[in-house]
Amino acid sequence: MLPLYPKKMQKKLKLAVIALCYVPLAYAQTDETQSQKAAAMDESAFTFTEAQLGDNDDMSQNVTIIGSNNNMYADRVGFLFSPVRFRYRSLNQKYNDVHINGVLMNDMESGQFRYSLVGGLNRMTRNADNVLAFENGGYNMPNMAGGVNYDFRAASFAAGHRVSLGAANRNYTLRGVYTYSTGLMPSGWAVTANLTYRWANRGYVEGTFYNALSYFLGVEKIFGNHSLSFATWGNPTERSTQGASTDEAYWMANSNFYNPYWGYQDGKKRNSRVVNDYAPAAILTWDWKITDDMKLTTSVFGKYSMYKSTKLNYNNTDNPQPDYWKVMPSSYYDVFDESNEANRTLQALGNWTTAYSMFSGSKANRQINFDQLIYSNKMAAENGQDAMYFIQAKHNDALTLSLSSAMNMTVTDKSKLNFGIMLGTNKGSHYQTMEDMLGAKSFHNINTYALGTYTMDDDRVQYDLNNRNGAVGEGDKFGFDYDILVSKGFFWANYSADMGRWHANVAARTGGVQMQRDGKMRNGMAPEFSYGKSGKAHFGELGGKGSLTYDAGHGHVIALGAGYEWRAPQASTAFAAPEISNDFVDGLKNERIFSSELSYQFHNSWLHVNLNGYYSRLNHVTEWQNFYFDDINSFSYVSLTGLRKAYYGVELAARIKMSSMLDLKLLGSMGEGKNTNNAQVRYMNSTKATYARETAYVKDMREAGTP
């Protein structure tokens, strides 16, 4: 049943939800990097930046670190294809596990690793151990897109000083790096330190800036068969962002780098979208070499991440964005449909010409006019009105604690056994604050979206019934405030053995996940189910995989791998409308994941070839997102459940030795990642907290962010 709107409005909301389910994201950055052993690559060849690597919550970005000593395709594809935003096998980054000293670093809510955690620490991430999905891992059962373990022990870095200075025309324009390491000293101590600074007063895109300081300090003491190492690092960053616009705006601005997020205030440039990101982290690792064939590694990790992203918003007035569709020429006159007589009148043509002249005639006209917004707010304040325009900030903070312990054993000369446990807990705090009132004198914690449906004295317009009509000043919370609590633990093991020409590997993992919401505001749309803690959702996890490799001789090697897992859904998709209530998504289930791979390798003195074929199938996938629906002035929260997905394709890599000084390298991939069924969609909007259900006809729609 649709919410109680006029029929025309119901139809628009329904169409918007279905369109959202149909269309993959218009823009999703997908960067990968080479994860070879670091010494083989010059640092200047490829550098991560936060904007490339997915710490911007405004976009869906997926970065995959892959590498292999045995698979030439996996060893090179991330680095070589990164400029075209290639995503390994079309897989979401949550299927790629990133570890530091054996501790899993992927975010416990989203499952993804945020590369801003190690931003600027290129030298520190050079000591890496990579595994593919069906290889033997010493720190976990490898995920479907493989994994990597970074070694942050101070003694692992080469002794000496290293200074690097660089200039670039990307998000930052200047970069300086200083690294110092003692190496392992005769006393058994080792110290490593790194300092990186990246800066841009203006990035490549106008209206952007960048300011980031990265630091690392590691200390290690080796005594007898034991080693204790401690490392702490962080990457405090302040940067502004660029916004995607339409072809119409790019055409009139005469630039594909037009950025609608900035404008002039007192004659100076100001960006409305500014990100502040800082996640200080520390890890303590104990290594115990029990015997020459047995080693125990235990690590304790802690991190407190603080992420804030600002945005220009408005209240009971027109949208101030300069590229808002209602002020663009195309909203007045239809230049494409000659039969649309209503929008092809002389008056409409005149409006089109006026809008075109306004937008294209002056740079200031196509940017945010902060001075005008401040003036409007001051006039409203004189009349006793709340802020019409303001800068809000969304916060995603998290406190993470993790423990990992792994035993690595050489059972015989031809067999190895690895097993271990991981425990972790995460408290994610999500809230909104008033960043800048832009000259206004007052603002109140009222759901202005709902005022078109309910009167001012109705409880349902209150964001917090525990503090009705709460006054909001700069720095105060408003709109929503809640925590997501996640705890997880699992046991893993893998065993590998050589048997003549055969090599076998088996791995297994079992554990559980618990998740819960803790609301800090009693929302008027859900007064009984928004304040305080929700119930707890529990999910068991179980999985196994195996591979068999045959060395046929004369350089020919064939390998086959397959696995099946039950994986818990992510907490970031588990709640139907987390900004409003404690409700879990209906039909929330474990993902069922089948993965398989067949590969062939040939290697001789002048030719090296890798050919891989893969097929993966996912069942009971849950996806969640929210969006602003302009026609009804409301945010909508959308959950898709029961999704099935398939990923399949072939990969080819070849290196031909043309001469002693020249190699020809070929790399290619052809694959598919898509939905294989229509899903159930359940949605609600912020103006009337009732749910509607539909069928989303998403079968054969391709994975978002892929070609």
Regions found by a protein language model. Give the residues of each.
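Gram-negative outer-membrane beta-barrel transporters
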Residues: 501, 615-617, 638-707
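Short acidic/polar hinge/loop motifs at secondary-structure boundaries
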Residues: 66, 72-74, 103-134, 151-153, ...
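Transmembrane beta-barrel wall of Gram-negative outer-membrane proteins
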Residues: 167-200, 204-242, 274, 280-291, ...
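Signature of Gram-negative outer-membrane beta-barrel scaffolds
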Residues: 390, 416-553
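Surface-exposed extracellular loop regions of Gram-negative outer-membrane beta-barrel proteins
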Residues: 238-240, 244-245, 249, 460-471, ...
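N-terminal periplasmic accessory domains that precede
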Residues: 55-67, 84-87, 115-119, 128-130, ...
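Extracytoplasmic beta-strand/coil segments of soluble accessory domains associated
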Residues: 63-104, 133
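Acidic/polar loop-and-plug regions of large Gram-negative outer-membrane beta-barrel proteins
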Residues: 222, 227-285, 308-392, 456-473, ...
